[in-house]
């Protein structure tokens, strides 16, 4: 299972691929032997140059060993969550820069390719190991949760890991030996696993298991209640069930009496409801009749009013005609009066003219 998952996941170079560190002193000895063999092939005139070159190589080896030890200590401190001291960091950086300047480019490229291959192999191997460990831990936790409830596995493993870490720390303090990258990666991953185990994720798992247990108990109780209710209904539905022992009790008799009283009350209520329904129907019929009468009365009143309006309009028309005739007669009379008045004035003027000459003649 783990190998299949690893084949699906692409492996990449780890963060340790950037470190230019040799695997052990054996590679250095092999390089020195090769350099020494090539030095022997040279002429005898360059013997002094060879001795100087050997001294330089020895110094380089010593510097490389010191660099490896400093980097190993730094990686140990990082794995066990320790802050490295500032002077050691400065010395390691200076040594690394000096070594990178002194090492030729061909060796650096070869070392770089070798380290890349090793890192890829290490990452794939470590990924497989982590998957296997995770699967085993999950299985163990599941089995222990079934058996013991909420116990968690992982405490003895952490103790073993701590013992191994202490031994490795003591070895690093006592012996100035180089440590391979596998051990550092293992220690780092084990420390991370310890932190994950110590993290407050387990109470949540416990709460989850407790909830599961509560849900299971609730479901079981519901099923039991359903079974009990089904058994009771079946016992009541069977003809073998007799009410004789229940009738003997006083409670059943009291209940029967109460039921009879309630039935009588229900009958009375039903009769009252039927009476009220009949009354409601009568009132409804009366209301319908009243509505019809009111509608008819309103129509009659409207018809009478319209007739009266017609009569009044006819009277109005007659009166207007009379007024017009009277007005014409009045104007005629006025014209006659005016004519008579004019004639009267003339008549009076003629009489006066006749009287005046007669008076003058008498004088």
UniProtKB/Swiss-Prot annotation:
Predominant subcellular localization, coarse grouping: Golgi
Keyword terms of this UniProt record: Coiled coil, Golgi apparatus
GO cellular component: Golgi apparatus
Domain of life from the UniProt record: Eukaryota
GO biological process per UniProt: signal transduction
Locations listed in the record: Golgi apparatus
Compositional bias per record (Basic residues), positions renumbered to this chain: 160-170
Residue ranges the record marks as coiled coil: 54-79, 247-298, 328-348
Biased composition (Basic and acidic residues): 98-107
Region (Disordered): 22-124, 143-185
Family indicated by similarity: Belongs to the GKAP1 family.
Function: May play a role in the regulation of insulin-dependent IRS1 tyrosine phosphorylation in adipocytes.
Entry protein name: G kinase-anchoring protein 1
Source organism of this protein record: Xenopus tropicalis (Western clawed frog)
């Amino acid at each position: 299972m783990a190998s299949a998952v690893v084949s699906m996941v692409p492996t990449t170079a780890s963060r340790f691929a950037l470190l230019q560190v040799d695997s052990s002193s054996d590679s250095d000895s092999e390089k020195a032997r090769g350099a020494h063999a090539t030095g022997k092939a040279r002429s005898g005139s360059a013997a002094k140059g060879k001795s100087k070159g050997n001294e330089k190589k020895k110094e380089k080896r010593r510097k490389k060993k010191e660099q490896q030890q400093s980097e190993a200590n730094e990686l140990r401190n990082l794995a066990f969550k320790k802050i490295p001291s500032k002077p050691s960091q400065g010395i390691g950086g200076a040594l690394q820069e000096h070594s990178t300047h002194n090492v030729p480019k061909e060796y650096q490229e070869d070392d770089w390719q070798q380290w890349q291959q090793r890192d890829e192999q290490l990452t794939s191997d470590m990924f497989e190991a982590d998957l296997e460990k995770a699967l085993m831990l999950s299985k163990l936790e599941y089995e222990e949760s079934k058996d013991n409830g909420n116990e968690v596995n992982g405490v003895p493993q952490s103790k073993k890991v701590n013992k191994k870490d202490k031994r490795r720390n003591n070895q690093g303090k006592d012996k100035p030996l180089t440590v391979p990258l596998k051990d550092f990666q293992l220690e780092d991953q084990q420390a991370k696993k310890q932190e994950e185990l110590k993290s407050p994720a387990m109470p949540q798992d416990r709460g989850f298991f407790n909830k599961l247990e509560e849900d299971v108990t609730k479901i079981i109780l519901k099923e039991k209640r359903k079974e009990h209710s089904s058994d009771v209904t079946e016992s009541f539905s069977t003809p073998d069930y007799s009410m004789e022992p229940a009738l003997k009790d006083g409670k059943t008799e009291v209940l029967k009496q109460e039921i009879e009283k309630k039935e009588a009350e229900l009958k009375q209520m039903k009769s009252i409801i039927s009476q009220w329904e009949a009354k409601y129907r009568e009132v409804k019929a009366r209301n319908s009749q009243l509505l019809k009468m009111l509608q008819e009365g309103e129509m009659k009143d409207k018809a009478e009013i319209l007739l009266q309006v017609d009569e009044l309009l006819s009277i109005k028309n007659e009166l207007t005609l009379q007024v017009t005739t009277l007005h014409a007669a009045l104007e005629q009379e006025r014209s006659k009066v005016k004519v008579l008045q004019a004639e009267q004035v003339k008549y009076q003027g003629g009489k006066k003219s006749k009287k005046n000459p007669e008076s003058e003649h008498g004088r």
